[in-house]
Amino acid sequence: MSIFIHKDSRVVVQGVTGKEGAFWAKHMKDMGTQVVFGVTPGKEGQDVDGIPVYHSVRRGIKDHPADVAMLFVPPKFTKDAVFEALDAGIKKICTIADGIPLHEAIQIRRAALSCGAMVVGGNTSGIISVGEAMLGTIPYWIDRVYKKGHVGVMTRSGSLTNEVTAEIVKGGFGVTTLIGVGGDPVPGTRFAELLPLYEADPDTHAVVIIGELGGTMEEEVAEAMEAKAFTKPLVAFMGGRTAPEGKRMGHAGAIVTGGRGTVKGKTEAIVKAGGKVAKRPSEVGALLKALLG
């Protein structure tokens, strides 16, 4: 069983005729993802690597039913593209756009929640259910990083994702579904909102979260564990442990407020809730072995 996407997911790629959209749509197809059509306004009738292009999601979905949307759309057009997918009835959306205006990110999240949809991103490298389907810009072909197994991964960091996931594989494990929630201040979906999906998935035996300085997503995970809303073994790695106090760095979401958001505070919360925290990526595999045997 996979989370968010699987081998039967039918994907529309919005922004498919752009350089990034065309490049990564091909890689999504090459992995086995069912990319059923693409969208670029004004370019209906074109073809991108065998993917038919339509003017809008509504027009394309009449000929090619789809249940997932992948957006390769600039930040200033992302809100409209998300709303277009929602209006067409799509409930699972992923957007890689980095720098979506804050007020529009809030509107996107509210709109998705109001209609029972889930938007992952922006500022994410994407989602992969290993061996089944991929959304975004994930280098699925690196076997030492993306091997199928029983560990779910949630990440805020694109650069740390490959490093930590490689350590999971080196430790003798593999990945069910990896979801990059993104590093912006207002992500469409937060770690704690994804935990119930991993909790319900029989193929996921443990979860690794790749967090970082700032925000409160990791503390929210600890709260879910304390409340027994998530009961599976959990290992966390947090980037920014040695960051100088008061220095601006990293993603827009790397903001410490009201004493919350520090790596020290996140670590204490996760440990108190029963999770394990790796001080460096190389410790992740050993911690999983200790928990899973």
UniProtKB/Swiss-Prot annotation:
PROSITE patterns in the cross-refs: SUCCINYL_COA_LIG_2
Gene Ontology biological process: tricarboxylic acid cycle
UniProt GO cellular component terms: succinate-CoA ligase complex (ADP-forming)
Activity's dependence on pH: Optimum pH is 7.5.
Active site: 251 (tele-phosphohistidine intermediate)
InterPro entries linked: Cit_synth/succinyl-CoA_lig_AS, CoA-bd, CoA_lig_alpha, NAD(P)-bd_dom_sf, SUCC_ACL_C, Succinyl-CoA_synth-like
GO molecular function: nucleotide binding; succinate-CoA ligase (ADP-forming) activity; succinate-CoA ligase (GDP-forming) activity
Top EC class for this record: ligase
Annotated binding of CoA, by residue: 17-20, 43, 96-98
SMART domains according to UniProt: CoA_binding (SM00881)
Signal peptide: none
Reaction(s) this enzyme catalyzes, per UniProt: sulfoacetate + ATP + CoA = sulfoacetyl-CoA + ADP + phosphate
Pfam entry (one): CoA_binding
Homology family: Belongs to the succinate/malate CoA ligase alpha subunit family.
Role this protein plays: Involved in the degradation of sulfoacetate. Catalyzes the CoA- and ATP-dependent conversion of sulfoacetate to sulfoacetyl-CoA and ADP. Cannot use other sulfonic and carboxylic acids, and shows only residual activity with 3-sulfopropanoate and malonic acid.
Subunit details: Forms a complex with SauC.
PANTHER family linked to this entry: SUCCINATE--COA LIGASE [ADP_GDP-FORMING] SUBUNIT ALPHA, MITOCHONDRIAL, SUCCINYL-COA LIGASE SUBUNIT ALPHA
Name of the protein this chain belongs to: ADP-forming sulfoacetate-CoA ligase subunit SauD
Native organism: Bilophila wadsworthia (strain 3_1_6)
Taxonomy of the source species: Bacteria, Pseudomonadati, Thermodesulfobacteriota, Desulfovibrionia, Desulfovibrionales
Gene transcribed to yield this protein: sauD
